[in-house]
C-alpha cells in the first residue's frame, strides 16, 4: 500500500478536529466539517487522515459514480441505461463489487468541467456519440470531497458545490443532459485571516471546528519526531499505527450499524432548540444538525440513547459556531448585581479671585488666546456595539457571496471555463472544450468524405475560447482633510475610523492609499499598498493645521488611481473625508483666487472622477453651524455617495464608509 498521508491516529493533539472527522464518517448525513486554522496548524494533514477511516462500500460494477445497488432511484444515467428492465437483468443479477470509499480532492484552480463533468472525448471520438464522464462531484459520491482553502474557491464553483450538496447533480451542457448522485461528506479547510466561508455554504456544513496552535513543548517535540519518522519510511511508520487505525475503522462500522437505533427524548431535543434560540442561531438547519450529531456521538460511544455529553458535543460543534449573540458565563450569571454607583461629589463652591495675582499677569478674559499652528490627535478607540458588529458581519457576508475581487479576461489569469469566441476579440483556444464540442460529430464528418483522411475533424463551429479569472481587488484611496478647520471636527475620530477601515481592506484583499491635505499642498502619505501597519503608522503621525488644499487633494487622488488601474486593481474608490472648506488653489504659485474661483476649480476636478471610471464617497464632517454645504456639491459633481456626519465618532464614520464602499463595489 502506497502511503502519502499521516494516519489520523498518529496526529498529536487536535482532539476536537479528530472527533468531528470521525463523527462525519459515522453519519455522512451531517454533510461535512469545516476546519478553520492558521497556516501550519495541520488542517490538511487532519483532513487527509480521514481517507483511511472510511468503511468500504458496495457499488455497481464499472460505475465511476459509485452508485449504490440498494438505491436504484438514485443511479446515474449510465447505470440506468445498463441495468434497466430492458437489459434482462434482475436485481440479484446486477453486478456488484466492493471498493474503498472514494476520497476526492478539489484543487483551487479546478474548472467547472472538472468539477461537474463533461463530454468524454475518447469515447465520443471512438463511438461518434455524446458520452459523458463525471467530474469530481460524481467521483466523490458516497465518500469524501476535500477542498483546501474553501473560502477562496471561485464563486461559480461554490454555487455548483452548493447545488450538489442536495444529493443530486444535474449536468446540462454541450448537448448532453445527465443526472448522477452526489452524496458526499465535504471536508473544507481554510485560514480565517484570508476571509470566512460564504454564509449559504457554511450553513450546509454541520460541524465547524478550529485547529489551534499547539503550545506544549513536549507535544511540539513529539510532532517533529513523528514527522521525521514518517518522512524517512512512510509504510513502516503507518504500520506502527495500523492496529489503532483498524480498531477505529471497526468502531466506525459498528457505530453506523447502531445509529438507526439511537433515540433522543423530546426534552433533549427542546434543549438543543433552546440553545439555538438563546444564541441567536438563524434558521432550522442547526436544530436538525445538532440532533443528528448528538445521535452520531451516542452511536460512536456504543449507546442507543442520547446522554448529556452527546448534547454538549452537538452544542460545541454545531450551535456555538453559528451563534450571533454573546452569552454571559455561568459564573457571571450567578453573581449578584453590582452595587449602585456612589453619588457624585457635591460641586465645589466658586473660589474667590486670588488677591495675589502677580502684577505682570493679565486677567484671563483679557489675555490673547494663543493657538498652536499644528495639533496632534491620537486615534480614537472604536467601540463596536452589537448592532454595529451585526451589520458589519452582514456586509462582509454579502461581499463574499458575490463576485467581489474577481476579474474575467480573455488574456490572462486562471483558466476557469470555456465559451464561444466573442466576435472581434482575440482569444486563446480552449483545446479541451473544442475537442469535446467536435467529438460527437466525428463519424458523421468522416462519412461525408469532405475532409479526406483526417483523424480528428474540427470546424469553426467547434472552436471554444478560454475565459480566465484573476484576482482584482479594489484600490481604496482615503483622502483626509488635515487642515486647521478639521482640528475642531474630531480629527481623532477620523484617525480611529481609518484604522478600522484599513483592517477591513486587508481582509478583503484590497489595496489602500492615503492622501492627506493641509497647509499649501496635498501629500500621498501612503502609496497603494496592502501593508496595514505601514498605513497606520504614518497616519498616526499626521499633524493637523494650516490651510485646506482640497483641489490639489482631489487631483492627486485621481492621479494615483489612474496610475494604479489595471494589473491587480480592477476598481478605484476615492473616500473623501472633509468639511468642504477648501481655501488653497490647485497652484498656490499662480496667485490668490476668490471663493467662487476656488469652488469652481474644485468642482471641475470632481467631475473628472466619474470620467475616469472611478467611484467616490464623500463624508461631510462640517459643523452644522459653520457648514457651507459645499461638500454636497462636490458629491453631486462626482456622482458620489454623500453622507453628512456633523457629530462624527470613529464608530459611526467607520461603519458609514464600510457601508458606502460595499455599495460602490462592482
Swiss-Prot record:
Molecular function terms from GO: ATP binding; magnesium chelatase activity
Catalyzed reactions: protoporphyrin IX + Mg(2+) + ATP + H2O = Mg-protoporphyrin IX + ADP + phosphate + 3 H(+)
Enzyme superclass (EC): ligase
Coiled-coil stretches: none
Entry annotated with the keyword Nucleotide-binding: yes
Pathway(s) the chain acts in: Porphyrin-containing compound metabolism; bacteriochlorophyll biosynthesis
Keywords of the record: ATP-binding, Bacteriochlorophyll biosynthesis, Chlorophyll biosynthesis, Ligase, Nucleotide-binding, Photosynthesis
Enzyme nomenclature, EC number: 6.6.1.1
Protein function: Involved in bacteriochlorophyll biosynthesis; introduces a magnesium ion into protoporphyrin IX to yield Mg-protoporphyrin IX.
Protein family membership: Belongs to the Mg-chelatase subunits D/I family.
Protein's name in the database: Magnesium-chelatase 67 kDa subunit
Organism of this sequence: Heliobacterium mobile (Heliobacillus mobilis)
Higher taxonomy: Bacteria, Bacillati, Bacillota, Clostridia, Eubacteriales
Amino acid at each position: 500500500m502506497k502511503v502519502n498521508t499521516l494516519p489520523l491516529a498518529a496526529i498529536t493533539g487536535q482532539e476536537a478536529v479528530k472527533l468531528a472527522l470521525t463523527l462525519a464518517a459515522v453519519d455522512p448525513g451531517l454533510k461535512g466539517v469545516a476546519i478553520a486554522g492558521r497556516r501550519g496548524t495541520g488542517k490538511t494533514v487532519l483532513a487527509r487522515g480521514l481517507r483511511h477511516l472510511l468503511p468500504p462500500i458496495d457499488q455497481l460494477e464499472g460505475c465511476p459514480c459509485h452508485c449504490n445497488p440498494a438505491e436504484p432511484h438514485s443511479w446515474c444515467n449510465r447505470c440506468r441505461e445498463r441495468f434497466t428492465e430492458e437489459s434482462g437483468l434482475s436485481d440479484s443479477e446486477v453486478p456488484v463489487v466492493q471498493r474503498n470509499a472514494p476520497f476526492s480532492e478539489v484543487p483551487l484552480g479546478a474548472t467547472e468541467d472538472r468539477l461537474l463533468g463533461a463530454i468524454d472525448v475518447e469515447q465520443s471520438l471512438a463511438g461518434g456519440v455524446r458520452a459523458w464522464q463525471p467530474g469530481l462531484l460524481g467521483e466523490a459520491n458516497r465518500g469524501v470531497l476535500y477542498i483546501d482553502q474553501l473560502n477562496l474557491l471561485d464563486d461559480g464553483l461554490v454555487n455548483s458545490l452548493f447545488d450538489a450538496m442536495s444529493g443530486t447533480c444535474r449536468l446540462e451542457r454541450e448537448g448532453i443532459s445527465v443526472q448522477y448522485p452526489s452524496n458526499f461528506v465535504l471536508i473544507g479547510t481554510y485560514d480565517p485571516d484570508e476571509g470566512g466561508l460564504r454564509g449559504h455554504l457554511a450553513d450546509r456544513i454541520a460541524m465547524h471546528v478550529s485547529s489551534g496552535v499547539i503550545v506544549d513543548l513536549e507535544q511540539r517535540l513529539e510532532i517533529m519526531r513523528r514527522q521525521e519518522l514518517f518522512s524517512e519510511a512512510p509504510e513502516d511508520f503507518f504500520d506502527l499505527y495500523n492496529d489503532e487505525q483498524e480498531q477505529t475503522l471497526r468502531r466506525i462500522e459498528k457505530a453506523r450499524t447502531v445509529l438507526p437505533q439511537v433515540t433522543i427524548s423530546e426534552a433533549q431535543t427542546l434543549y438543543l432548540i433552546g440553545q439555538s434560540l438563546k444564541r441567536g442561531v438563524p434558521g432550522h438547519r442547526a436544530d436538525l444538525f445538532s440532533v443528528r450529531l448528538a445521535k452520531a456521538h451516542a452511536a460512536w460511544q456504543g449507546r442507543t440513547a442520547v446522554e448529556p455529553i452527546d448534547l454538549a458535543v452537538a452544542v460545541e460543534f454545531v450551535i456555538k459556531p453559528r451563534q450571533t449573540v454573546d452569552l454571559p458565563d455561568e459564573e457571571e450569571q450567578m453573581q449578584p448585581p453590582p452595587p449602585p454607583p456612589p453619588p457624585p461629589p457635591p460641586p465645589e463652591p466658586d473660589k474667590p479671585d486670588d488677591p495675589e495675582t502677580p502684577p505682570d499677569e493679565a486677567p484671563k478674559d483679557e489675555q490673547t488666546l494663543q493657538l498652536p499652528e499644528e495639533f496632534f490627535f491620537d486615534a480614537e478607540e472604536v467601540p463596536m456595539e452589537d448592532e454595529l458588529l451585526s451589520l458589519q458581519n452582514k456586509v462582509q457576508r454579502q461581499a463574499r457571496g458575490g463576485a467581489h475581487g474577481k476579474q474575467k479576461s480573455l488574456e490572462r489569469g486562471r483558466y476557469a471555463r470555456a465559451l464561444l469566441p466573442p466576435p472581434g476579440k482575440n482569444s486563446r483556444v480552449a483545446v479541451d472544450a473544442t475537442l469535446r464540442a467536435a467529438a460527437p460529430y466525428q463519424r458523421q464528418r468522416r462519412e461525408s468524405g469532405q475532409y479526406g483522411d483526417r483523424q480528428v475533424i474540427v470546424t469553426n463551429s467547434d472552436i471554444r475560447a478560454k475565459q480566465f479569472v484573476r484576482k482584482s481587488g479594489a484600490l481604496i484611496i482615503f483622502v483626509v482633510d488635515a487642515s486647521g478647520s478639521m482640528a475642531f471636527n474630531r480629527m481623532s475620530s477620523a484617525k480611529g475610523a481609518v484604522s478600522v477601515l484599513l483592517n477591513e481592506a486587508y481582509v478583503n484583499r484590497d489595496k489602500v492609499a492615503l492622501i492627506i491635505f493641509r497647509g499649501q499642498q496635498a501629500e500621498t502619505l501612503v502609496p497603494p499598498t496592502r501593508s496595514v501597519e505601514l498605513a497606520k503608522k504614518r497616519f498616526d503621525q499626521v499633524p493637523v493645521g494650516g490651510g485646506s488644499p482640497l483641489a490639489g487633494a482631489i487631483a492627486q487622488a485621481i492621479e494615483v488611481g489612474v496610475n494604479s488601474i489595471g494589473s491587480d486593481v480592477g476598481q478605484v474608490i476615492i473616500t473623501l473625508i472633509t468639511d468642504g472648506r477648501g481655501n488653497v488653489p490647485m497652484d498656490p504659485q499662480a496667485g490668490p483666487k476668490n471663493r467662487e474661483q476656488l469652488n469652481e476649480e474644485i468642482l471641475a476636478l470632481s467631475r473628472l472622477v466619474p470620467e475616469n471610471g472611478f467611484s467616490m464617497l464623500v463624508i461631510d464632517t462640517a459643523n452644522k453651524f459653520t457648514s457651507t454645504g459645499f461638500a454636497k456639491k462636490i458629491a453631486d459633481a462626482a456622482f458620489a455617495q454623500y453622507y453628512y456626519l456633523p457629530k462624527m465618532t470613529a464608530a459611526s464614520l467607520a461603519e458609514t464608509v464600510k457601508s458606502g464602499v460595499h455599495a460602490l463595489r462592482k
